[in-house]
Amino acid sequence: MTIESGALEQKKAKIESGYGTLATPSSTDAIRHLELQLQYKMNRERSPQKRGTPDHASSLPRRITAGFDLSSAMWEPSGTLGTASYFGPLLKAAFGTQTTPNLATTIASSSLTTGATLTSGTGLAVGDTAVLTIGTGARREITRLKSVAGAAVTWDAVSAAPNTPGAFVSGVNYKFASTLADSLSIFLFHTGGGYKEAVQGAIVDKVEFMFDGTKEATIKFSGPAKTRVRTGFSQPGAHTTVGSPASGLVGNFYLDG
């Protein structure tokens, strides 16, 4: 019998082709986490029926429930503009829409607090967020696009007109949709003992972001699932996550209300 020693769990998450259709995990579906549990309960109840002897009893089946709780993880960027982090599938399932303009351009002219003409507006859409460079101290502010007409764009007002030329960047955006259409298959592998399990039809019911000036940004996801399975899938040969592990308080976070 193999005894587990050390952190030998691997977790993977992948968007399903349809609700409850178990996805096929690959090495690049890997996620880094501090704590993640897959949940499953039979919900059987003791029968109220009287029996001839007190030492015999039966239980009644109920609806089986399943779910997942990613209760602790550091939110690490991919390190590449336009490339989602390894939590991309979970964030898309939580918000409903993911767009990737993947645009790093400059402000060409007509710079105002509410808009400008860009060198290029390729890939932008109304509702996308953008990071602008403002002032001599190269302060950065985030805003949301209100209109896009080629390279001419307007946005929610910022504190001052952006620099000309100044950087205009829009990477990965998540937007609320009226319908959350994506479900997930979430896999757990114990590499030492060969144990594996998964939940399919997982829905992100709750997501939390935590920001502290003295700590790394953390994120939580949780929600119900259709069911739990232990067969029908295999562990990929590698565990490859996007980007690099957190190595200090670096980078910026922008939130547009």
Predicted feature locations:
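Signature of extracytoplasmic/envelope-associated structural regions
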Residues: M1-G257
